[in-house]
Design a protein with these regions (language model features):
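Conserved core of the sugar-phosphate nucleotidyltransferase
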Residues: 70-145
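Active-site glycine-centered loops adjacent to acidic/histidine catalytic or metal-binding residues
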Residues: 67, 90, 182
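Short internal beta-strands
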Residues: 13-17, 88, 247, 263
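Conserved N-terminal catalytic core of the sugar/cofactor nucleotidyltransferase
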Residues: 1-65, 74-76, 267, 271-275
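Left-handed beta-helix
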Residues: 142-277
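Conserved beta-strand segments of alpha/beta enzyme cores
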Residues: 34-36, 107, 168-170
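Structural beta-sheet core signal
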Residues: 13-14, 63, 84-87, 171
Length: 277
């Protein structure tokens, strides 16, 4: 979200669900834009989610899925000669993703979900710019009018409908893409971000800190070994523990434990644990 500055953004619209209050509080505190929050009460897919924002979108729109961290030049949206942009990243394990198939000029022709053969290695990362928003709504209407696929309607099907009606969507490759959609990839992404400069080290008497780490103010640690690749939020207390490659939320209590590859939420209490969590 920090990368949208300078793009002439007039409003941020968040489609929320689980932990909506946490999202709202964070967004209001973090971003200096007007924010609107819409709860998706029926989990009917990405097309259904974006359709909830329709009454409030009257011009070009940037759509960002929240389970990914990316490095991309979003200023391309201001100059591109196209009806939209779909950002993608070349991957070797293309079988795990929806991939973007393009023509010779780099414009999307279709998206293939989890192909068994390498029709493309450009993974769809969930970052889009749509200039022709009316064509987007027409595509979503078409998708929502058809039977749902296992209860969900997909935004990429709306893009396919746009292409079939002669709209041009450019596939642009990102410099970096870090997935946060599963515990393992979230921990991996956390380590990458720490190594790239997000680290924040604090030292404590009798505690060994192995960089990179991110430790907020208000954390207390005693007789422990922390890091590498550990993030700890404010209010957490740790004692007599060894913690590596782990993310810990606010106000947690951890004692006499060895943790590696763990995700601990806010106010979690752990004692005598060995392993991941």
């Amino acid at each position: 979200m920090d990368r949208i500055e300078g793009l002439g953004v007039t409003e941020l619209i968040f489609i929320t669900g689980h932990l909506k209050e946490t999202v709202e509080a964070y967004a209001k505190d973090r971003y200096g834009y007007p924010c609107r929050f819409i709860e998706q009460k029926v989990q009917d897919g990405t097309a259904g989610a974006i359709n909830l924002a329709r009454p409030f979108i009257h011009g070009p729109v940037m759509i960002i899925y929240v389970d990914t961290v990316f490095e991309a030049d979003l200023s391309l949206a201001e100059t591109v000669d196209a009806d939209g942009i779909i950002w993608a990243k070349e991957v070797e394990d293309y079988q795990r993703f929806g991939v973007v198939v393009t023509d010779a000029d780099g414009f999307m022709t279709k998206i293939v979900e989890k192909p068994s053969t390498p029709v493309s290695k450009l993974a769809n990362i969930g970052l889009y710019y749509i200039r022709d928003v009316q064509a987007l709504w027409a595509g979503i209407d078409h998708v929502l009018a058809a039977p749902a696929n296992k209860g969900e309607y997909y935004l990429t099907d709306a893009f396919q409908q746009m292409i079939e009606h002669k709209r041009r969507i450019l596939a642009a490759e990102v410099g970096g893409w870090y997935d946060c959609g599963a515990p393992g990839t979230l921990l991996e992404t956390n380590g990458i971000l720490l190594a790239k400069g997000a680290a924040r080290r604090r030292d404590f008497p009798g505690v060994v800190i192995s960089d990179p780490v991110y430790i907020e103010d208000g954390v207390t640690i005693e007789r422990s070994s922390i890091g590498p690749n550990v993030s700890i939020e404010a209010g957490t207390h740790i004692s007599d523990s060894t913690i590596r490659n782990t993310i810990i939320g606010r106000d947690a209590r951890i004692a006499t434990s060895v943790l590696e590859g763990a995700l601990l939420g806010n106010r979690v209490k752990v004692a005598g644990l060995r392993g991941d969590a």
